[in-house]
Amino acid sequence: MTNKIVTKAMIMSAGVGSRLEPLTYAVPKPLIPIANKPVMDILLEKLRELGIKNVICNTYYLAEKIIERYQYNQLGIHFNYIKEDTLSGTAGGLKKCQNFFDKGETFIVLSADGLTNADIEKGIASHIKSGAIATIGIKQIPHEEVSHFGVVVTDENGFIKEFQEKPTVEDAKSNYINTGIYIFNYEIFDFIPENTFYDFAKNVFPELLKKRKINTFEINEYWTDIGTLAQYKQSTKDLFFGLCRFKHTPIINSASGKYINNGSEIPACTVFEGTSTIGSGCKIGKNVKIIDSIIWDDVILEDNITVKNSIIASKSHIASDICDEVIGSNEIIQKIKAWFLGYFLLDLEETAQVCKSYLVKIKLYRGTMAQR
């Protein structure tokens, strides 16, 4: 079923993604893969299912990579974009897209790091019925986690009466949070000045509160913010366990615990434990063990190594055991032999990480000495 009311949407895509470093050194946050597919692909497919074909993004960090991927996409989306010279805030970015929307229309705004299969159609219906200027998708979470999010307090009719920005557990008046899924009327632009850094939570919503014009709809389906490394890892596990469902991936409730894209070379002797994904074009050596890890495209893993609880970005070359590591794109991790004052360090598990900045990081785990 597709809606017939909302025909346009915006995806906020300008963020640098510093909490996902080093993955975002070479890849913008919207292109971070979930089960080997960029999160923005998933969002665009979700919008297409709703009947929304016209989408605009505000870009800033690594903008050309986003534009290159979607300007001539095969997703059935008419992709539009603006390039920001400086960051404008969440609301300021929307303001720069104002000419894309028609006066009087209702539209959707999503965050590029929000992974969800929310019933947005339910949100649209709630928005229209409410007469609000803005409707926010809210999610109930465990009370002990509220300090990481913007908390919303609603009245008996679902209208917001108070916001709390990352309150302490003791001070939180609710355990419902703002998911960054918005449905707006065109009138929202009246509350955002031109050429000003402006934020929804800090600047726009307080003004709408005075007019009692912010409605909510509850998201009972899956939603997560993949803006941190920990949550990025968890979202992949959630796919395996069937907690979130997206049409593009076959790994839901996978008994094998692994998802491998076509075109990767995986020997039969490879051992998988836990849940792992492997991108396309990867070359895995003999007797490799992969445990609870996310491996992007075109990665090389040498023989006789173990990769555990790690993320390896595209085109990296791994020749040493790694555990609890996050490796950015185009990096080399290898075992090396070291000499010191005429002594050879034996049984030394050293890792040399040679990254694009040409720095070398040495990790000494254990070693003994023998004369040269």
Predicted regions and their residues:
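A short, conserved acidic/glycine-rich loop-to-beta-strand motif
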Residues: 130-140
